[in-house]
Structures are given as C-alpha cells and as structure tokens.
Amino acid sequence: MTAADGMVIDASVVLGWLLESDPDPHASQAMEALDERFALVPVLWHFEVANGLRNAVRAGIHPPETISAFADRLELLDIRTDSVTPQLRRLGNEAVLCGLTAYDVSYLLLARDRGLPLATFDGELAATARSTGVDLAFEIN
C-alpha cells in the first residue's frame, strides 16, 4: 500500500462533499481522486458520516430519503474500512500527547501506520499530522 494508491479520508471531507450544494474544491478533488485511488477509513468513520447525515436531515437541510441516496453514492467509491483497531492505551496516550480527541487520533494513526496522506478539514488534526510527519492530501486555509 503506497501513498500513490490511496489516502485516509475523514468524515469532514466526505460530508463536505455530500452535503454542500457548492462543495469545497478540496473535498471535490479528494473525492474525484477516488476514481483512481482508494480511501482507507477507521470503523469510526461510518458512525461519523451517518451522524452527519442524520444531523443534516434533523436540521431540515436534506430530506430523510437523501441518506440512502448518499449511501448509494459512497458505495460506488473504493472506500475500505481498516480492520485493525488501535488499542485503547495507544489511542488514549496519543490523544493526550497530541491534544486531539481519540476520534481524530484514529485517523492520524491510520495515516501514519499505513504511510498514507490524510484528507481532513479539521485544522488541529491537519496541524498535528503535519508536525508528526504525516502528509496531507491537500492544504487547508
């Protein structure tokens, strides 16, 4: 598995692409890259995306049937769920060390352990990735 083959993509990028009527160009670029590359995500990603979709429905931004439509769009992409879950000790220690949530650390560790770039709109996660030698799929402003 090489960086040229794939990337770790967090829920912020996917939700920015799915939910926005005019998606951020970085989100569109990352998702278009999945035509030729794969995305690797932690199990947590599925919960975060589902919750983001639920929040959009609950806020009246999208009707309930869009959840299935969005899921159908995502199923067309090569999004792979990592089968290795970091141990509680490692997640907790890294979260304290980095000053991030354990949720964000799961993406950071996945990118670091697999040698893949990270796609995120989370500024703190991006800064920590950069400072710990994890490449970013794109730079955010």
Predicted regions located by residue number:
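Acidic, PIN/NYN-like endoribonuclease modules and their adjacent C-terminal/linker elements
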Residues: M1-G6, L108-N141
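Alpha-helix capping/helix-boundary segments
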Residues: V13, W45, P86-Q87, Y107, ...
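Short beta-strand scaffold positions
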Residues: I9, V41, A102-V105, T120
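Short, well-structured N-terminal submotif of metal-dependent ribonuclease cores
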Residues: M1-L44, A56-S68, T132
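Acidic catalytic patch
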Residues: V43-H46, I67-C98
